[in-house]
């Protein structure tokens, strides 16, 4: 999941922080980079877990409605959303389960947000279309959750604020993580059952080494890059350039 574009983005942010905080400890800065990247992967799993949390809430509502229908002799409610095939498969996914166990992760502390998200989804036109559709199969269930995620999880200001409170590392990561979640939903296949592979933290170990080497090279060769910038822009008024803009110009020199 952690690709080279995300790595470069993180390096720009952390190189800026490296020079701003004045504590030029390369080893600590490198550890911070790798930790920041690992937090992006945590967010990816946490967003997948949100789908499971909403599904569990739907199942609780279904159980209440079913019990009421049985008492009153009424027609049983639809279980289409509560037992959405894709969401059930995700709930049983071994890789996600291992991550949840390792991180002791849960949405229980934010159940009110989960309930609000459930309400927003079930009150929507896209939900009504899903429930009314005669297409009742795995592919339709998977596509429904792709739409729910795109419409109600992406660009969700309340969720953004909630995530920022949980980790400052997630403040700038959600937009790119959302694309990986949508990619993951699209890749799910029913026949893979609980063994469906999620995106790995790194596509290969070379990407982790790439992050370390690029970061070190950017820091260690800073003075040389500064001379390059000065020679290439003699007529610029550097006193009016923002540090962030200047830093962003340096990193492309290190594109490998």
Please provide the spans of the model-predicted regions.
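Class I Rossmann-like S-adenosyl-L-methionine
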Residues: 1-256
């Amino acid at each position: 999941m952690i690709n080279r574009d995300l790595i470069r983005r993180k390096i720009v942010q952390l190189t800026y922080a490296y020079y701003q905080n004045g504590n030029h400890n390369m080893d600590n800065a490198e550890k911070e980079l790798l930790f920041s990247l690992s937090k992006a992967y945590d967010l990816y799993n946490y967003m997948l877990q949100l789908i499971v949390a909403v599904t569990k809430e739907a199942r609780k509502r279904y159980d209440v409605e079913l019990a009421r229908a049985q008492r009153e002799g009424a027609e049983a409610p639809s279980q289409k959303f509560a037992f959405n095939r894709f969401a059930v498969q995700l709930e049983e996914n071994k890789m996600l389960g291992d991550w949840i166990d390792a991180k002791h992760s849960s949405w229980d502390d934010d159940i009110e947000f989960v309930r609000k998200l459930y309400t927003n989804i079930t009150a929507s036109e896209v939900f009504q279309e899903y429930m009314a559709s005669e297409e009742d199969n795995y592919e339709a269930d998977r596509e429904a959750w792709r739409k729910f995620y795109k419409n109600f999880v992406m660009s969700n200001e309340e969720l953004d604020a909630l995530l920022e409170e949980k980790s400052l590392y997630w403040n700038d990561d959600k937009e790119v993580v959302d694309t990986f979640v949508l990619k993951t939903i699209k890749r799910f296949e029913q026949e893979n059952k609980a063994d469906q592979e999620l995106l790995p933290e790194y596509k290969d170990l070379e990407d982790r080494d790439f992050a370390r080497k690029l970061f070190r090279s950017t820091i260690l060769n800073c003075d040389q890059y500064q001379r390059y910038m000065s020679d290439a822009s003699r007529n610029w008024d550097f006193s009016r350039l923002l540090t962030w803009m200047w830093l962003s110009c340096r990193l492309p020199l290190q594109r490998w």
